[in-house]
């Protein structure tokens, strides 16, 4: 993801927002629960929906970089 967000979020992210999102992605959870998502959104000044979209897109980017299937549970023998 670009450092300033993207069109899917409908908002340009600041460096501080990206830093908070990335730290949570790498140190807390790649799949935050509803409460954690709400707290991250509040810290970033984003809506819960925008934050959830960011995590979905960031997960897709991470999975692609790791050579993993596009979706969870889609590993094939």
Curated annotation (Swiss-Prot):
**What GO CC annotations are associated with the protein?**
cytoplasm; nucleus
Q: Does the keyword Cytoplasm apply?
A: yes
Start-end of DNA-binding region: 7-65
Tell me which UniProt keywords the record has, alphabetically.
Cytoplasm, Developmental protein, Homeobox, Nucleus, Repressor, Transcription, Transcription regulation
InterPro entries reported for this sequence: HD, Homeodomain-like_sf, HOPX
In terms of domain of life, where is this protein from?
Eukaryota
Q: Name one GO biological process term.
A: regulation of transcription by RNA polymerase II
Compartments, record wording? Nucleus; Cytoplasm
Q: Which residues form a coiled coil?
A: none
GO MF terms, alphabetically ordered:
DNA binding
Q: Does the keyword Hydrolase apply?
A: no
N-terminal signal peptide: none
Q: Which PANTHER family match?
A: HOMEODOMAIN-ONLY PROTEIN
Q: What does this protein do?
A: Atypical homeodomain protein which does not bind DNA and is required to modulate cardiac growth and development. May act via an interaction with SRF, leading to modulate the expression of SRF-dependent cardiac-specific genes and cardiac development. May act as a co-chaperone for HSPA1A and HSPA1B chaperone proteins and assist in chaperone-mediated protein refolding.
The name under which this protein is listed is Homeodomain-only protein
What is the protein's species of origin?
Answer: Danio rerio (Zebrafish)
Lineage here is: Eukaryota, Metazoa, Chordata, Craniata, Vertebrata
